[in-house]
Amino acid sequence: ADIENGERIFTANCAACHAGGNNVIMPEKTLKKDALEANGMNAVSAITYQVTNGKNAMPAFGGRLSDSDIEDVANYVLSQSEQGWD
């Protein structure tokens, strides 16, 4: 996976709601490590599924981003969660 590309995709498509690993719509559903684990989202496959298909207030990006871009952004999110989004 290309983490640098994932960061670019995140900044362009995700940061409006998820800057710094937060969640402006549902504050308890952050991209922080503990929240990802608690919600069963601490795997690339789980994140790629949700980014592709959307859920609740989160739109589906499957029609807007390529599979490889979605995989890159999922790897970026997991990488950042391991580093505490610092």
UniProtKB/Swiss-Prot annotation:
The gene is petJ. Binds 1 heme c group covalently per subunit. InterPro entries: Cyt_c-like_dom (IPR009056), Cyt_c-like_dom_sf (IPR036909), Cyt_C6 (IPR023655), Cyt_C_IC (IPR008168). Belongs to the cytochrome c family. PetJ subfamily. One of its GO terms (biological process) is photosynthesis. GO terms for cellular component: chloroplast thylakoid lumen. It is found in: Plastid, Chloroplast thylakoid lumen. The keyword Ubl conjugation does not apply. This is Cytochrome c6. Monomer. Its main location: plastid. Functions as an electron carrier between membrane-bound cytochrome b6-f and photosystem I in oxygenic photosynthesis. It comes from the Eukaryota. Keywords: Chloroplast, Electron transport, Heme, Iron, Metal-binding, Photosynthesis, Plastid, Thylakoid, Transport. HAMAP family: Cytc_PetJ. Signal peptide: none annotated. GO terms for molecular function: electron transfer activity; heme binding; iron ion binding. Heme c binds at C14, C17, H18, M58.
